Amino acid sequence: MKNMYFKGSIVAGIGVAIALSGFQWGSAPKYKPRKTDPAQSAEGVMWWYKTMKANQITGEVDPADYYQAWNQVRKEKNSNKSLGLQWEEMGPWNVGGRTRAILIDKNNPNRMYAGSVTGGLFYSNDGGNTWNIYNAELNNTCISTICQTSNGRIFVGTGSTAEVNLAGNANSTGSVGGGIFEITGNGNFTWIVGPGATPPNNSTSVDWAFVNKLEAYGNRIYAATNKGLRVADPDNNGNYSNWFNPIYVSCTNSFQVTSDCKDVSVASDGTVAAAFGNKIYVSPNGNDNTFCTIYTVSGASRILVEFAPSDPNVLYYSATNTSGCLASIGISLDKGNTFDIIAQGGGSFDPYTLTPTQGGCQGWYDMSMAVYPNDPFKLLVGGIELFRWYKTQSNPVFGQWQKISSWTPQGNFNPYYVHADQHFIVFKDNNTAYFGTDGGVFRSSNLNDLNPTFVSLNFRYATAQFYSLGISSYINSNNGVDVIMGGTQDNGTQVMGLPNVFHPKYGFEISGGDGFDCDIATVSDVLFHTVYFGSLSRSSSSGASGTFFDSELSTACQNGCGPFYTCIRYWDTYYAPNTKDSVQVVLSNNVNPGDTIYYESSTNDIPLYFVATQSYNNGDTIKLPDYVQNKLAFANPIAGTIYLTRQAANFDKNPEWDRIAGSQSIPDAFSGTAVCMEFSKDGNHLFVGTSNGSVYRISNLMNAYDSATSDIRSSSCVLTCTRIGLFSGRAISGIAVDPNNPDNIVVVLGNYGNTNYVYRCINATSAPSSNNTSNFVNITNANLPKCPVYDAEIDMNDKNRIILGTDWGVYACSNGFTAVGPLVDWAPEKTGMGNVPVYEIRQQTLPWAPNAGVIYAATHGRGFFKTGSLVGIKEIEKNITNVEISQLNLFPNPANDVINIKIEGNQNSMAIVQIYDLKGALVKEASFNGLSKGIARMSMNVNELRSGSYIVKVVNGEQTFTRKLLIQH
């Protein structure tokens, strides 16, 4: 018998076999810039929060429901039934998320604090150059403001009504806080006032749910809340227990103002200004019923106020209208009695949009303002970008505006770059200020220059808000970092583990804007990434990058398509035994039966082989099976549809896309907006969840290999679409498919204000059509907080181990499929991670991968995490019971220098031999090609291994064999 090597080309047709190809990146892929302006991002994210979090009936998150979940989280303790997951922070350490609060310690200017709206409180001891998490328990408290009293105490406010939808309904997005807490050092904190201090019992009160701004004068604290301005002085014990509302409709009116107080500012002499709707109230001292100066700002909906630090008579306001566009900016020289307008809305200047006079405004979302400490007539205003104003004339006061930052192009090569969306500004001195943005913390140290420059200060400020997660089977050999990727809110799609990156925990932004669903191919070095409104691209290590639509989708998505959240899912395999594709090979030698023909797949030139069963002559053209297969599903490019391509991983041709689901699907028409999708391990089924509660199964994908058999508009289409569940209009936020049995799936739901969030199904591939939940069993029990569950994963080694990503972190069970529904026992699994929202969880289920069994989590506020707690000797040894020991012979055992392996395989394929130490670490690996069905023999050198016990795992096609090995030297 001979081995022969030939080059092949793809032909649509028949059968395939495999050889392993590594995921290799020679250099970072090309960056794909943001496609649309930040205004679409801000409005879109609030739509997404509402879809996932708000109650499906009321359209709001009732604070009482939020607090019920939070109170349960605060009382929970680790259960003895928990899996004991230990989470490791992965970064990215160079990407900051939305930041609305920064404080410089007045007693130590190098000590700083910064607050993320979903990632918690961070501190720095070196002026912002390096950050650390203060306490992970505070990760999901929507930190909105920080202040410091004269005696040095530091207080943090939570919840922000700027985290709203365009209609101004903060409750719809779930950006609820818990009042005010004091940080007391060493990670400790004490709740001072609000639901955090006194948990309500299903109260409908929303007092202290949103603290928009804290200001201190002396030791008095002013709090701008959703129920008005609140003021408190410390008692003799230093407690802030007596809060009062000092503002009345007028000084002669007994009715207090209890509407949303957007901002408060205190002058150097104690004068106080507070902003409500379209009004500014001013008091000489902040005492009860002293806010007698009332100024109305025409057309205003949101107002910020700021006194000049060097002159208490000078007060500025910046106001936006109900559309988020500039209403006006004014300056007062008499403590708010009168104002001169220094910027009028409706003109060519509007810091809250990139297109003045054309809309696209977002002042309802991003507004910031600060006066230079040493110059009362020099002002910074932040919207999408930063602007500076300085006075050029008096009586009336007027001045000049200058844009001093640029949100694009981004990166260190642009000295004026500051991430889009400005939320907070604080001066350190007359020339230095810090900025809180959608991209974390920035600083300028030359603000008096004509053209100030800026730097990012996000090292270890790991507050990126991820929506999605893509994992690979590759670990960078240079730095040991797993190659993963994820889509973020306003920080694009970030890739970790690439070579030539400055720090192993740094991310590389492969595309800008808001990144959503993403995936990494196993059979090629291709990354798939998305942006809002149906923007889908792929990138390869060769530097190739771009969209890959056919003519139909190019037309549909020319100006954007689909909803804000772009939903995709990718599947591939090295070995699809029933493949219908083939490679055409021209022989350059005679071939006899039993000869091995080596050739290449049409995907990534992956080496394949075929054992000849008949004779061929030199020059013959034959078709050999292409076992390497891939599928990419793309949801919603046209409303109520799902498309699929089988050439996504092949850069050599423009992929063809087929409509695999839509109104013409049978037996059930597909409808709704898909928000999650999962393939079965064999790629034969695609499970789809929609925003209105439907779960669909699209089946027979294995036999759909061209447009005639795949496209539902074809009379020859072989696909079926079955709605197997309907969950009362709630968002299907995630689906998990058992990697060992696609009949087992878990469906999880969003939306506060409900009781049940997790369901299982044990006949998912055959479940009949249903307009209810009859195919599912509810497995939510009392131990699981009543909050949105965003994703689930079924452990590859034990279907009973189900891991959930929720609005309050990770939970898991160990009896998910064997226990009666109500007895499924959930327990918190947050060690190393905290209470941060987890939007996606994925496990590496490829048994040969170096990260096999590792679970990854994409958090919405703390970046990526991973755990190998379920990987190790227990899981490896457990596999021994899953195979016939007689199928694997290992000798000699104990061994010294060489081991011989004999297996009984059920197919022609290659084998991968892995040796693990007793810690579960992979210490040696080898692959053996050209193995025939039946008895196969291999030898492997082990003389470099230290004496001790090991586990040998052999992966042969779909079979896995495991044996213990003892090395004795």
Language-model region placement:
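Beta-propeller blade termini and top-face loops
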Residues: F23-L870
